[in-house]
Amino acid sequence: MSNEEINIHEAEEQLSEQEMLRRQKLVELQEAGKDPFDVYKVERTHSSADVKDNFEELEGKEVKVAGRLMSKRGQGKVVFADLADLPGKIQLFIKIDNVGEEALKEFKTFDLGDWVAATGEVFKTKMGEVSIKVTSFELICKSLKPLPEKWHGLKDPDLRYRQREVDIITNPEVKDTFIKRSQIVKAIREFLDNRGFLEVDTPILSPIAGGAAARPFITHHNALDIDMYLRIATELYLKRLIVAGFEKVYEMGKNFRNEGVSVRHNPEFTAIELYEAYADYNDMMEIMENMIAYVCEKVNGSTKVTYEGTEIDFTPPWRRITMVDAVKEFAGIDFNEIKSDEEAQAIAKEKNLEFPKPLDKVTKGEVLNMLFEEYGEDKLIQPTFLVDYPVEISPLTKKKRGNEMFTERFEGFVYGREVCNAYSELNDPIVQRERFEQQAREREYGDDEAYMLDEEFMSALETGMPPTGGLGIGIDRMIMFLTDSSSIRDVILFPTMKPQK
C-alpha cells in the first residue's frame, strides 16, 4: 500500500458516520450522472425576499430560487422544506403530483446543508405562508459535512470564530451583524466623499513602523534583503499627501499591532485616518461627532443606540473635558497644583502606577495620562472628547495655544473605551525632529512602543505642510457599539486565533 493510499485510509477512518453516508450519496449521484459539482451556473430569477415582498405580483407565476436546504418536513406524497439564501428563507412545497414519484424519492435523500435550485409556482399555504409549489429541482452542491443539530448559533465562542461560515449559516443574527458592518463602512465613506475627501491607498509594508505608539509585526523582504514592518498606522504617508497638495484625504484599511488579544483588541484591525489642510483639532471634533451621527441615522434610524443595556446618545455635540479636569473629577488630584516631575512621581508611587521605564525618568505629563487611564477612562460612558494631552505622549501634535505643556490632541471615548484620536498636526520639522529624538531615548529606556524616526517623512515635512487637522477612528470598535456586540471578535469576520493543534 502506498503512502498516499495510507493517508486516504486514515482520513476515511476519521470521518463520522454521517460524513461517510453523505460521501456515499455523492458517489451514487455521480454514478447516476447527476454530479452536483458539475453544475457551473444557476439561472435564479428571484431571491426569497423578492418572492415574499412581491407576492401579489408573483402569485401563480413561475420562479426559480436557490439556496441551502435548512429543514425538511413530511413523508409520504408531500414534503415541505426551507431553503435559505442571503435575505432569508423560502418554503418549498414538493408534491408527488407535481414532480413525480422518482423525483420526490430523490429529494427525500437530500441532506440538510445541501444546496438546491428549485423551480415552481408562487402560492400561499393554508397557514398563510408564502411558498413555492415545486415542479422541478436540482442538487447544485452536496454538503459533505453535516451542520450541527438543534443550533441557534454556536455555543462555544472559540468554535464560532474558527468556523465563522457555519456560525453565519446557523445564526441569522451573526449574518445581520456583518451586513450592518458593510452598511456602516459604506455610510462612513459616503459622509466623507460628500465633504470632498479623496480616498487613497498607502503602503501596508514599510521600512519604518511609524504614526502610532505600538509594537509592530516584522517581516523580511527577500529580494531587497531588508526587514520591513506591517503598518501600525497610515498617518505619515497621508501627511505626505497633504504636503503634496491634496487638501482632504482619507484611507480605510487594515493596521497591524503585535500586541495582546482581548474583547477590545485584535492584532489585525480596520481603521480610518483622515487629514484636512487648513483645519485643526476643533474641526476634527466636528467631523467625528457629525459623521457618527450620520452613520447612526443611516444604519439604525436614530442617533441613540443601546449597548449592553445602556443607552448611548451620539447626538452632537459630544461632551468636551480636558485631561486635567478629568483627573481632578475622577481621581481627586488637581494637576494645576503639581509643579514638578518629582511631585508627580511621588503621586505615581503612592498610587502604585506602573510605567515601561524607571520611575525617576517619568514626567509629570506621563503621570497625568496614567492617572486618567487608571481612574477616569472607564467613567466616560456617553460620547466624550478628552482634550489637551501632555506634550510628552503626543509627539506628532502641535502644542496647545496658550499652554505649551499640553497639545491640541483629543481622544473620543464611548462606554469607557477609546474610539478615535485626533490632532492639530505638528508641521514644524525642527520641533518634530526633536520629538522623534526624544522618542528614540524612550526606546532606549525600554519602551518598545515609542515612535521610530522616519527620515522620508521628515524630508516631506521640511518641504512644507500647511496647518492640518488629522483624525483616526477604530472602525471595529465603532461597529461594536452600533451592533451591540460585546467583543471585537463578534464584528470581525475571521479574528486572529491561535492555531489548533
From Swiss-Prot:
Pfam families named in the record: tRNA-synt_2, tRNA_anti-codon
Binding-site list for Mg(2+) 2: E418
Entry binding sites for Mg(2+) 1: E411, E418
InterPro entries linked: Aa-tRNA-synt_II, aa-tRNA-synth_II, aa-tRNA-synth_II/BPL/LPL, Lys-tRNA-ligase_II, Lys-tRNA-ligase_II_N, Lys-tRNA-synth_II_C, NA-bd_OB-fold, NA-bd_OB_tRNA
EC number(s) given by UniProt: 6.1.1.6
Subunit structure: Homodimer.
Similarity-based family: Belongs to the class-II aminoacyl-tRNA synthetase family.
Protein name, per record: Lysine--tRNA ligase
